[in-house]
C-alpha cells in the first residue's frame, strides 16, 4: 500500500473555458506538478482550443493536446453543425432548478472519454489526481457532471489501473462541484486567473468572440454580474 497522503502531481482537464482555467489555477496552488490536457474533438470552433494553449502558456504548465474525432459520432450541437445551439431563453434557469431534459449541447459520453484519456495520462505522469471542472449547481442538465457520476468514475479508475491495484489511490478532484458561477469567478480571481483569455461561448467565432445568447454565455453573464467583478469580461 502507498504510504503517501499528500497529493503531488495532477492532471487537469483544460477546455479553455471559465471553469477549467479556474481548476488549473486551483491545481497549481494545491499540487507540486501539474499537467494540463485539452482535446481537439471535432468541436464547432478551435477558438476554445487556442484559448487553452494561451492559458497553459500563461500558467507555465505542461500542456498536452489529444485529437479525438467525436464529430464522427454526432449527436450534439457542439459537434454537429447541422444542429442548432439554442438560446438561453429556451432553457429554464429559474430558482436554479435543472430541466429534466438533457440539452442538445450535451456531447454523448464526452466526460467519460476525456476522463479516460486523463486517467491514462495520470498513470504515465505518476499523478494521483485528475482535476475536472464539473459543477452540480449550474450544470445545465448534463448527466456526466453529477457527483454520483464522479464517484463512480473514481471507483472504476482505482479498479482499472496499475496504480490503483498497487494501492496508489487516484482521486478525481472537483473543486467547483458545489460552487455557483459567481463563487467560481471569485475563486479564480483570488488565484490570479485572467478570464480575458477564456472562451465560454458555445457559438464563439474563430476569434473566440461570444454570441452573448447561448446557455454558456448566460451562465457566464450571471456569474460576473453576481460576483460584481469586471463586467467587461462578460461577453469575452
Model-derived features: positions:
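ATP-dependent adenylation/nucleotidyltransferase module used to activate substrates
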Residues: 2-191
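Short cysteine/histidine-rich zinc-coordinating motifs and their immediately flanking basic loops
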Residues: 213, 223-232
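Secondary-structure transition/capping residues
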Residues: 129, 164, 195, 225-228
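Conserved S-adenosyl-L-methionine
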Residues: 66-68, 194-203
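Conserved small/polar residues in nucleotide/adenosyl-binding loops
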Residues: 234-236
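Local cysteine-cluster metal-coordination motifs and their immediate loop/turn environment
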Residues: 199-222
Amino acid at each position: 500500500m502507498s504510504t503517501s497522503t499528500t497529493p503531488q502531481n495532477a492532471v487537469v482537464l483544460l477546455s479553455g473555458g471559465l471553469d477549467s482555467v479556474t481548476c488549473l489555477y486551483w491545481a497549481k496552488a494545491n499540487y507540486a506538478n501539474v499537467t494540463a490536457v485539452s482535446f481537439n474533438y471535432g468541436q464547432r470552433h478551435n477558438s476554445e482550443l487556442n484559448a487553452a494553449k494561451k492559458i497553459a502558456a500563461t500558467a507555465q504548465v505542461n500542456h498536452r493536446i489529444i485529437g479525438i474525432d467525436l464529430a464522427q459520432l454526432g449527436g450534439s450541437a457542439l459537434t454537429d453543425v447541422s444542429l442548432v445551439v439554442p438560446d438561453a431563453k429556451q432553457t429554464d434557469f429559474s430558482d436554479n432548478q435543472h430541466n429534466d431534459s438533457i440539452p442538445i449541447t450535451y456531447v454523448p459520453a464526452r466526460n467519460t472519454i476525456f476522463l479516460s484519456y486523463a486517467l491514462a495520462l495520470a498513470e504515465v505522469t505518476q499523478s494521483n489526481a485528475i482535476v475536472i471542472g464539473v459543477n452540480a449547481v449550474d450544470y445545465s442538465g448534463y448527466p456526466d457532471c453529477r457527483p454520483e457520476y464522479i464517484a463512480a468514475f473514481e471507483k472504476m479508475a482505482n479498479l482499472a489501473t496499475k496504480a490503483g491495484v498497487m494501492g496508489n489511490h487516484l482521486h478525481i478532484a472537483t473543486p467547483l462541484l458545489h460552487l455557483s458561477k459567481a463563487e467560481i469567478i471569485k475563486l479564480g480571481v483570488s488565484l490570479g486567473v485572467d478570464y480575458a483569455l477564456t472562451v465560454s461561448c458555445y457559438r464563439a467565432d474563430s476569434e473566440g468572440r461570444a454570441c452573448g445568447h447561448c446557455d454558456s454565455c448566460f451562465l457566464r453573464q450571471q456569474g460576473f454580474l453576481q460576483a460584481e467583478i469586471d463586467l467587461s469580461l462578460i461577453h469575452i
